[in-house]
Amino acid sequence: MHEPAQNNPAPFHSSDSGKELDLSVEIAGVRWKNPITTASGTFTLNARACYDIGRLGAVTTKGIATVPWPGNKTPRIAETYGGMLNAVGLQNVGMEAWIRDELPALRSVPGLPIIANIVGKTVEEYAAVAARLSETDVDMIELNISCPNVKEGGIAFGTTVEGVYATTAAVRKAAKKPLIVKLSPNVTQICDMAKAAADAGADALSLINTLLGMKIDVYRRKVVLANKTGGLSGPGIHPIAVRMVYEVRRAVPLPIVGMGGVMSGEDAAELILAGADAVAVGTAALLTPDAPIRILGELRTVMRKIGAASVRELKNSLVEPA
């Protein structure tokens, strides 16, 4: 991305480059010291060997189910132009093992909000995980509604208004923590899904999840992934994420965690300008584990260059076309 031309309209009347930036944000009543979190599926405790995770605004876990999930057969990762396909299959240790083995290490980091991402194969499974995690000291729950509904022939929960509403409502009833609903981009009208989640009791939204894609090896004449299809992530989907965040911000008054191809501080600022309150970093962290911290530093630089003193000020400064 390139720095805007100097003759572009300035969104701020003045700035003080020496003033300390206010990077804090509040998502559904939970204060983050800055707007950067990890995207679900891309963070493990091994990141502690690469950087101080306490510098993050929040940490988002891998998907947590009622019982361990083995994940899909290999190969389940494939590179593409502008990103990658993954069909890991939400492999996880199950909620009891996660609570016993991983939560204490995260909880030991002072001032770091923990967002527990939950997955399920039925509405009842989602509700059970939400209820169990609500008994712990996680700070927020993120509902991944891109999982296939085994009772409805494998249709993803998040691709119909009815599925979004029913799943969100059930989890909202079971959860005693602020609830973020993670929206799928594999829909015709994402604003309809956002409204359904809001109507069912979501406290915040996160978007976008991965786009469904496929890769074929033309010389072997075989589909690359054992699962055939996978979720496309990386810089290639970033413009789609920006567009969807922009649309959802104008349709629903809930806080938004924007994600999708965030590789730089400029990418993060772009999502905030589109209407996100916070930003999740995913694929970039798979390439270099400390990417979230680098992107946070770059976001500071962008804000100073354009004169935004706070994340809120940046979010409210988009110059719309005449």
Locate predicted features.
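Short, surface-exposed connector motifs at secondary-structure boundaries
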Residues: 30, 108-114, 174-179, 250-254, ...
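N-terminal capping/small domains of soluble enzymes
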Residues: 2-114, 120, 295
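Conserved strand-to-helix beginnings and helix N-cap segments that scaffold or border functional pockets
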Residues: 49-50, 126-127, 191, 289-293
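Hydrophobic faces of well-ordered beta-strands that scaffold small-molecule active sites
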Residues: 36-39, 59-61, 114-118, 141-143, ...
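Alpha/beta catalytic cores of nucleotide-metabolism and tRNA/nucleoside-modifying enzymes
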Residues: 1-19, 232-253, 257, 263-322
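Acidic-and-aromatic substrate-binding clefts and catalytic sites of carbohydrate-active enzymes
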Residues: 44-46, 124, 287
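Alpha/beta enzyme core
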Residues: 121-257, 265-270, 274
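Short gly/pro/ser/thr-enriched loop/turn and capping motifs at secondary-structure boundaries
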Residues: 66-70, 148-150, 212-215, 286-288
